[in-house]
Amino acid sequence: MVLQYPQNKILVLSDHPHNFSKTQFLQDLFHCSSTGISIVKDQTWENRYYKVHFDLYIDSCKDIPVWVEEFITPECEPLRNVMAGIILITDIRQTKPQELLHQFMIAAHRNTFVVLVNVNEEVEQDEIDELNEIWSNAFTNVIEFVNWKRSKPTVNHNDYGEKLGLDRIQEIIDTHDWLKCEVLPATKIREEIPNEMPLEQIIRNLQSARLKYKSIENSSEADAFANEMADELSRYL
């Protein structure tokens, strides 16, 4: 798949009643306090395997359904094509974004992840899980509903060890298939790997390593990276 545009933007959008939530969200997830700026250039996302530079787009709207109708028009196609991810912050019971997702996802680029962040504290995790079950296989994109509560910490994992809240959003960004990223040296990765590692962490590391392997254009470098990662992770299997 060859793209015509550099897909290196993440859009964070809220409707007007939740602008304060967006400000806190940007600080917590991206350590970004430049909320008065609509575009924050050259941000860095880094984990133990890679780092990538991206632009953070920050916006708000009066009504998300109206915004979606504008966003899916042909005129907005160039904007859609540069989006690595779109994060919508809203009250899902008021906005009911699931009613808009079908036409929205048809228009979105298939390599763009979409996260709907619910800030209504009356919404329980079971309700979020049901929405995720419905949409998990609807499109090839990553589409996920996430609960995020400012007034009280969100439990960061469920009974199965799956991440929730901000931790889950971080995981989505970590495992996104970035088209251009800088793979960290294997020696640095080796220093950061603990002596013991839980199974779910091993699985996440394998997923991240696989995506980074796919992003290395030079075949010999890719093979070398894969071999080194296999050697390191085999110590915990």
UniProtKB/Swiss-Prot annotation:
InterPro entries: Irc6
Disulfide bond annotation, renumbered to this chain: none
Keywords, alphabetical: Chromosomal rearrangement
A GO biological process held by the record: vesicle-mediated transport
Gene Ontology molecular function, alphabetical: protein-macromolecule adaptor activity
Keyword Cell membrane: no
Protein's job: Involved in gross chromosomal rearrangements (GCRs) and telomere healing.
PANTHER family named among the record's database cross-references: INCREASED RECOMBINATION CENTERS PROTEIN 6
Stated family: Belongs to the IRC6 family.
Name of the protein described by the UniProt record: Increased recombination centers protein 6
Gene that specifies this protein: IRC6
